[in-house]
Amino acid sequence: MFSIPPSVRRLVFLFLIAAPLLSIVLPVAAAPAGVDPPSKLQPRAPQPSRRMGATKRSKKIEPLKKKDYSSFLCPGGSVACPIPGDEVSPSSVEALEKSLNSLADWFKVGFECVELETELNSCGGCLALGSGQDCALIENARTTGCENGSCQVYSCFDGYVVSPDRTSCVKRGSTIPATPVTAVNVEEFVADDQLPFGQ
């Protein structure tokens, strides 16, 4: 037969004596005014159960974004631009974009590291990917540069003047020319922090 150790018997005896005394000393908290306490415990209201294997709400699947490999291929501030094999056209740009899916693809095609804010031949974007401009190809421009990602014309060939917005050359007399950058007015540019050629 099973016997209870004396220490456990003493604890049970103390509990049986102490429980009624505690209920007298610590009365049950009164219910808030105007609310009747329930006389019996009430069962929960029935609810439908979930079926096992019920379908979950489908999550929105976002299309995968192409990874930018420039940080792996070029030092800070530079962007990797693919080197085009042929003439750049909308179809060649599309084909090139589809073919550049991994680092290995970039090495197969070939690339150069370009600072798009200042690069004369790829100003503001990669020409092979259909963006940017080659500032050296501006018609009738003698000297050009790339400032803040946009081409700037500094001087034009004879018969042409720099346009007021400094992005092209126009026939002399067809418009008011831009103020030329000379040694006389360089001080104005220095005051405005607008020196050409990064001087």
From Swiss-Prot:
The lineage of its organism: Eukaryota, Fungi, Dikarya, Basidiomycota, Agaricomycotina. Changing Y160A: Abolishes Il4-independent and Il4-dependent Arg1/arginase-1 expression in mouse bone marrow-derived macrophages (BMDCs). Keywords: Glycoprotein, Secreted, Signal, Virulence. PANTHER family: APPLE DOMAIN-CONTAINING PROTEIN (PTHR35192:SF2), PROTEIN, PUTATIVE-RELATED (PTHR35192). It is found in: Secreted. The keyword Glycosyltransferase does not apply. Virulence factor which promotes fungal virulence by enhancing type 2 inflammation in the mouse host. Likely binds mouse Tlr4 independently of Ly96/Md2 and activates Tlr4 signaling to drive Stat3 phosphorylation in interstitial macrophages, which promotes the initial induction of Arg1/arginase-1 and increases macrophage sensitivity to Il4 signaling. This is Protein CPL1. InterPro entries: CPL1-like, PriA/CPL1_fungi. Induction: Induced at 37 degrees Celsius in culture medium for mammalian cells. One of its GO terms (cellular component) is extracellular region. Disruption phenotype: Intranasal infection of C57BL/6J mice with knockout fungi severely impairs Arg1 mRNA expression in lung interstitial macrophages, causes a modest reduction in lung eosinophil recruitment while levels of Il4-dependent IgG1 class switching and cytokine production in CD4(+) T-cell are not affected. Causes a decrease in type 2 inflammation and in fungal burden in the lung and the brain resulting in mouse survival. Abolishes Il4-independent and Il4-dependent Arg1 expression in mouse bone marrow-derived macrophages (mBMDCs). It comes from Cryptococcus neoformans var. grubii serotype A (strain H99 / ATCC 208821 / CBS 10515 / FGSC 9487). Residues 1-30 form the signal peptide. GO terms for biological process: effector-mediated perturbation of host innate immune response by symbiont; regulation of toll-like receptor 4 signaling pathway.
